Amino acid sequence: MRLSFILAATLTGLLACATASDSEKIIRISNEQVLSDRQLLDTVVNDNEKRFLRAYNDAEDDSEDPKNVKNTVDAKPADESEDSELSEEERFSLIQMSNQPRYYWWFQHEMTPRDVRRALGLRAGSIKLVKRSIYRGYVKYYNKHCSYYENRKKDFCKAKEY
């Protein structure tokens, strides 16, 4: 009786381990397929990025003189500052979207951006990126909502010092 019980428990354990290892293999295969599909998409994105990074020679730089030839690797696109601003906005857009209720509450309690800066504990030289992005998001929210007709004449909307 004891021997049959031990054999049954052992076989059940081995069967459970075999099924678990089979299911892990299936998951790994599907993850590899997903990654390969993602890599296909990434190559298209990388091609577009390379296209944007190309630098075109000006009419003045057409000479073959090595002093006048510029290296295309070191050349930067003209819209670099705009691209960096867009990427920064994308980076903090999730934070700003999640803070909309906070912005609404601050605005309903008639807090100016200066009051919000004090509430967040920001100073001129502080390096708190998340709090700075929250503050910048509120400044945008404040400017947008103070431009509405019903809010223009409110005292806290007339404050222009941030």
From Swiss-Prot:
Record's keyword terms, sorted: Host cytoplasm, Host nucleus, Secreted, Signal, Virulence
Induction: Expression is induced during host plant infection.
GO CC term, one of those recorded: host cell cytoplasm
Pfam families according to UniProt: RXLR
Keyword Magnesium applies: no
Residues spanning the signal sequence: 1-20
Compartment(s): Secreted; Host cytoplasm; Host nucleus, Host nucleolus; Host nucleus
InterPro entries: RXLR
Motif (RxLR-dEER): 51-91
Domain of life: Eukaryota
Region (Disordered): 56-88
Protein's UniProt keywords contain Secreted: yes
Biological role stated in the UniProt entry: Effector that enhances P.infestans colonization of Nicotiana benthamiana leaves.
Free-text note regarding domains: The RxLR-dEER motif acts to carry the protein into the host cell cytoplasm through binding to cell surface phosphatidylinositol-3-phosphate.
Family per record: Belongs to the RxLR effector family.
Protein name stated in the entry: RxLR effector protein PITG_06094
